[in-house]
């Protein structure tokens, strides 16, 4: 297995938007000092220090001579891949050791974003080990004995991390869950309690699960720093009463480029009426996304079962829409925020939001108009399946389906 390393620091902000983390190679001893054999890093040394707001919180120590198997058990021994085991050394024992551990693992995954599994060692009697295993953030290696004296080897899995395993509540990429917003109540539930509901509207006539309440307009619902772009991305439930939100939305919809795809050009009254219909519709939520606080575009996420699209793709399209499957739409409004990498970051984040807000969501679909320039971009930058062209009442579209397992395995979170 090829391990990526870097000789420079990597800095990012946490989902709270204020805390800054830096991971960088350990500093070499000053020329005037005589480094010891234990502290002098060689050219191949890949120990890394993790800083939170310029304070050292942990060090990842690696011994290239100690390797363990990272291929799953079904792989033949002669084909199995191995990687060096890293050891996390926390700078001090504090009540927030678990939080610092998660931050250090976050930094490690951004540093080695092309890996699927990272082996680490941790003392078996440590509360940190209990945190890692019980939350699913790490799993004991099935190839190493659990030695209670010498510690055990744990495997960090990329897909578990980005699904939110072990994430501190205050640092989740998902910033709002109304069903768990009452302090002291309901936070133990991993998902909104399932109960039947019914929708009859237009082309829709279906039973479906009752959906949780949406956060209040203006609420940040998702937040993540995008390393490749060097900016922080936020998804906010659009607030039509906020002049900044509304003027940006109206300007985008009235532009020639956006109108070609969305066909929603019109006076302010039309835009206000549309956003109000979105606000009161329990199956959909309108979002405005911002780069470093600057409005950049618009999106919609919704529950697919009770969406108008569902009845037109339920046959001969190669998909089954489940009770908790979702769908999304994306509109990049500002010209300066266009481009493949930014689109990939926004699209990945919107899909990430969908999968995080309900772990029972197994699929997120999209149906852009077939002739839009974003169609090949979607096919290129998202690990989703292009199913077929479908005829909807208002457009001829391309049906895309993104599966949960593939997203967390192949999604680009860097």
Swiss-Prot record:
Q: Give the family this protein belongs to, as stated in its UniProt record.
A: Belongs to the lysine N-acyltransferase mbtK family.
Q: Which E.C. number(s) belong to this protein?
A: 2.3.-.-
Tell me which Pfam families the record gives. Answer: Acetyltransf_8
Q: Output compositional bias ranges, type Polar residues.
A: 16-25
What is the protein's known function?
Acyltransferase; part of the gene cluster 14 that mediates the biosynthesis of a ferrichrome A-like siderophore which may contribute to organismal virulence. The first step of siderophore biosynthesis is performed by the HMG-CoA synthase (HMGS) MYCGRDRAFT_54740 which catalyzes the generation of HMG-CoA and CoA using acetoacetyl-CoA and acetyl-CoA as substrates. The enoyl-CoA isomerase/hydratase MYCGRDRAFT_76805 then catalyzes the conversion of HMG-CoA to methylglutaconyl-CoA.
| Residue segments, region Disordered | 16-47
- Classification via SMART domains: AlcB
Question: What are its GO biological-process terms?
Answer: siderophore biosynthetic process
Pathway listed for it is:
Siderophore biosynthesis
- Gene3D superfamilies tied to this protein: 3.40.630.30
Q: What is this protein called?
A: Acyltransferase MYCGRDRAFT_85486
| Signal sequence interval, chain numbering | none
Molecular-function GO terms, alphabetical: N-acyltransferase activity
Q: Could you name the domain of life of the organism this protein comes from?
A: Eukaryota
Which residues of this protein are catalytic? Answer: 367 (proton acceptor)
Keywords of the record, alphabetical order, are: Acyltransferase, Transferase, Virulence
Instruction: Identify the residues that bind substrate.
Output: 329
């Amino acid at each position: 297995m090829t391990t990526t390393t870097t000789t420079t620091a990597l800095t990012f902000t946490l989902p709270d938007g204020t805390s800054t983390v830096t991971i960088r190679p350990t500093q070499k001893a000053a020329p005037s000092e005589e480094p010891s054999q234990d502290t002098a890093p060689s050219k191949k040394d890949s120990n890394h220090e993790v800083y939170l707001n310029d304070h050292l919180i942990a060090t990842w120590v690696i011994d290239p001579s100690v390797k363990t198997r990272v291929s799953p058990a079904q792989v033949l021994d002669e084909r199995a891949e191995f990687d060096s085991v890293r050891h996390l050394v926390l700078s001090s024992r504090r009540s927030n050791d678990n939080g610092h551990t998660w931050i250090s693992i976050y930094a490690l995954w951004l540093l080695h974003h092309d890996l699927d599994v990272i082996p680490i060692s941790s003392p078996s009697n440590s509360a940190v080990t209990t945190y890692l295993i019980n939350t699913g953030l790490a799993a004991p290696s099935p190839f190493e004995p659990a030695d209670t004296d010498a510690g055990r080897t744990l495997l960090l899995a990329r897909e578990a991390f980005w699904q939110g395993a072990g994430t501190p509540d205050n640092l989740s990429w998902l910033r709002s869950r109304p069903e768990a917003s009452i302090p002291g109540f309901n936070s133990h539930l991993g998902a909104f309690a399932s109960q039947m509901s019914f929708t009859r509207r237009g082309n829709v006539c279906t039973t479906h699960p009752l959906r949780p309440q949406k956060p209040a307009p203006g609420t940040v619902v998702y937040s993540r720093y995008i390393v490749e772009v060097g900016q922080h991305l936020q998804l906010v439930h659009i607030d039509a009463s906020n002049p900044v939100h509304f003027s940006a939305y109206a300007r985008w919809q009235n532009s020639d480029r956006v109108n070609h795809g969305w066909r929603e050009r019109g006076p302010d009254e039309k835009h206000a009426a549309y956003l109000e219909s979105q606000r009161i519709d329990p199956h959909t939520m309108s979002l405005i996304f911002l780069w470093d606080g600057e409005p950049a575009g618009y999106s919609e996420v919704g529950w697919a079962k009770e969406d108008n699209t569902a009845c037109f793709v339920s046959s001969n399209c190669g998909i089954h829409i489940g009770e908790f499957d979702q769908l999304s739409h994306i509109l990049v409004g500002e010209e300066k925020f266009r481009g493949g990498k930014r689109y990939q970051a926004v699209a990945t984040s919107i899909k990430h939001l969908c999968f995080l807000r309900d772990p029972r969501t197994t699929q997120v679909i999209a149906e852009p108009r077939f002739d839009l320039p974003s169609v090949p971009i979607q096919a290129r930058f998202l690990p989703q399946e292009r199913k077929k062209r479908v005829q909807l009442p208002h457009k001829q579209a391309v049906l895309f389906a993104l599966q949960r397992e593939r997203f967390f395995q192949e999604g680009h979170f860097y």
